[in-house]
């Protein structure tokens, strides 16, 4: 059974809605994220999901995310997480770098399979 990929429009809409929800949760729960060291680090982890959703949003629109968009997304994420706590901002940068490696690995894995499929299909000769 082949899995269907969501359309660009639904990906943009879902990532935007989830971004707004996580942004609201960070602001509403800011007192919780300031309460202890573990909660502060958790705030950075939750903030890094904003980065992941921003990259999903940009990738669905542009299909190719460059270094500038990635750096701007990390800066925006760090600023939002820093509004909760400074340590949350720092840890969100660290977790966002982890997301960069994960997204790069997943992208390479998916697109290498697509290239192999295209090579096999186009490599056949007709007589």
Swiss-Prot record:
Compartments in which it is found: Membrane
Species lineage, top-down?
Answer: Eukaryota, Amoebozoa, Evosea, Eumycetozoa, Dictyostelia
Main role?
Subunit of the oligosaccharyl transferase (OST) complex that catalyzes the initial transfer of a defined glycan (Glc(3)Man(9)GlcNAc(2) in eukaryotes) from the lipid carrier dolichol-pyrophosphate to an asparagine residue within an Asn-X-Ser/Thr consensus motif in nascent polypeptide chains, the first step in protein N-glycosylation. N-glycosylation occurs cotranslationally and the complex associates with the Sec61 complex at the channel-forming translocon complex that mediates protein translocation across the endoplasmic reticulum (ER). All subunits are required for a maximal enzyme activity.
- Which keywords has UniProt assigned to this entry? Membrane, Transmembrane, Transmembrane helix
Task: Specify where it is mainly localized.
Answer: membrane
Query: What GO terms in the biological process aspect are recorded for it?
Result: protein N-linked glycosylation
Under the heading PANTHER family, the entry gives: KERATINOCYTE-ASSOCIATED PROTEIN 2
Instruction: State the family named in the UniProt similarity comment for this chain.
Output: Belongs to the KRTCAP2 family.
Cysteine disulfide partners in this protein: none
One cellular component GO annotation, for this chain's record? membrane
Output this protein's name: Protein KRTCAP2 homolog
């Amino acid at each position: 059974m082949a899995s269907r990929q969501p359309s660009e429009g639904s990906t943009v809409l879902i990532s935007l809605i989830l971004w707004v929800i996580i942004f609201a949760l960070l602001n509403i729960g800011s007192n919780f994220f300031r309460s202890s060291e573990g909660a502060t680090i958790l705030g950075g982890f939750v903030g890094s999901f904003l980065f992941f959703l921003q990259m999903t949003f940009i990738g669905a629109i542009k299909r190719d995310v460059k270094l500038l968009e990635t750096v701007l997304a990390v800066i925006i994420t760090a600023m939002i997480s820093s509004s909760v706590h400074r340590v949350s901002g720092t840890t969100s940068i660290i977790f966002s770098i982890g997301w960069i490696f994960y997204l790069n690995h997943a992208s390479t894995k998916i697109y290498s399979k697509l290239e192999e499929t295209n090579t096999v299909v186009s490599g056949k000769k007709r007589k």
